[in-house]
Each structure stands twice: as structure tokens, then as C-alpha cells.
Amino acid sequence: MTLRSEILVNKNVLPTAEQALPGRETPMTLPETHFVNGNPLLGPFTSNVEFAIFGLGCFWGAERRLWQQEGVVSTVAGYAGGFTPNPTYEEVCSGLTGHTEVVLVVYEPEKISYDSLLKVFWEAHNPTQGMRQGNDIGTQYRSVIYCTTPEQLAAAKASADAFQAELSKAGLGGITTEIEEAPTVYFAETYHQQYLAKNPQGYCGLGGTGVCLPA
């Protein structure tokens, strides 16, 4: 069994529920509106919207890529997939929460389909790297699709099979992306929300494989 002290050194190992930090009951306080488009960050929304959750490395660049898509109403940076309730960024970086960095996407399905969002997801990062994304190493950077409906789950799995076929043709490895029913998403601190709009010269490690998902 991996010790807690070893996880602090080796960020590629997920903690157990017993090893995870305890967290807290109070969620992060968020601004009411999206910094980029002025829409409500979490609602209420005037249009028919659906929700999607993606993790593709550092959420700064991931969130920007997703808010740039026409039909996306709002995006929120957060943490999901682990054990610690309402973690801080520092706690997530320790490797002792089990969470990965994610983006909650609010979108209008009449303007952008879930399949279109999946295409953006697969092509924007390298989903074969396990507990890392480029130079960002650790469990918090693992690739995930957390699905809010059975239809999303089926579509995500089908798209993974299709993208794996294209990766294999290109001589690349196997997909390591977690595809699961959506767990609780804990919101990240305000300074992480729409970070690259507030800090245009900020770090962005987002980078794809050059492989495209067939339409």
C-alpha cells in the first residue's frame, strides 16, 4: 500500500479515501457572472442549457478553449473525481485529494452539440499520458470526461473508440481518459475562474496530438 508521505513525493498515485485530506463543508464563493461573456456563471439561465464536465490538464487553458466555442453559455473551473470536499488549490496540488482539474461547461444544445464538445476535448489535449498533461505532472492533470446523462456516457465512450482508432493509425498510444458518471464538482477559487482572460500572458500548457476526430 502506498503511504501518504509517498503520494506527496510521487504525484502519479491516487490516494485512498482514508488517505485523502478531510476538506471542509463550506464551498468556494464565486462571482455571479462570467468574466468573459457576462452571462450568469451558474444560472439562472434564460435559454435551454445542458451541462458537461471535462478534464484535459490545467484548467486555465482548458476553460479558455471551451468558452471560445459558439453555443457555450458559461464555464466554471473546478475539481472533481476525488474524495476531499471543497478542496483548496493547494490541497489539490498536494495529490492528497484525488481530484483532477475540470471545467464545468454550460451549453445550448441547439447551438453546439455534445458531440462537437467531445471533438474539441479530444483534439485539444493528449489523452494518452495518464497522470500528466505535457509538463504538468500529477493526478490533478489526468484526462477525464464526467457525464451528466446516460446519453453523454454512451456518446463519450463511442467517441473514445473512434479517437483511439485514429491515434493508433498515427502510431500513438492508448487512451487513459476516465469516462464515468459525473461526481460532485467542487468549484475552484475565484482567481482561477476565466484565468487566462484576466491574465492573457498566463501559463497555458494545453496541446493536442495533431490527430483529428472524424466528424
From Swiss-Prot:
Q: Which gene encodes it?
A: msrA
Q: Does the keyword Ubl conjugation apply?
A: no
One GO location term (cellular component) = cytoplasm
Give the record's GO biological process terms. Answer: cellular response to oxidative stress; protein modification process
Task of the protein: Has an important function as a repair enzyme for proteins that have been inactivated by oxidation. Catalyzes the reversible oxidation-reduction of methionine sulfoxide in proteins to methionine.
Q: What is this protein called?
A: Peptide methionine sulfoxide reductase MsrA
- Known catalysed reaction(s)? L-methionyl-[protein] + [thioredoxin]-disulfide + H2O = L-methionyl-(S)-S-oxide-[protein] + [thioredoxin]-dithiol; [thioredoxin]-disulfide + L-methionine + H2O = L-methionine (S)-S-oxide + [thioredoxin]-dithiol
Q: Give yes or no: UniProt keyword Oxidoreductase.
A: yes
Catalytic residues per the record? 58
* Pfam families for the chain: PMSR
Q: What is its EC number?
A: 1.8.4.11
Give the classification, highest ranks: Bacteria, Pseudomonadati, Pseudomonadota, Gammaproteobacteria, Pseudomonadales
Q: Which GO terms describe its molecular function?
A: L-methionine-(S)-S-oxide reductase activity; peptide-methionine (S)-S-oxide reductase activity
List keywords of the entry alphabetically.
Oxidoreductase
EC top class named in words: oxidoreductase
Instruction: Identify its protein family.
Output: Belongs to the MsrA Met sulfoxide reductase family.
Please name the InterPro entries in this protein's record: Met_Sox_Rdtase_MsrA_dom (IPR002569), Met_Sox_Rdtase_MsrA_sf (IPR036509), MsrA_MetSO_reductase (IPR050162)
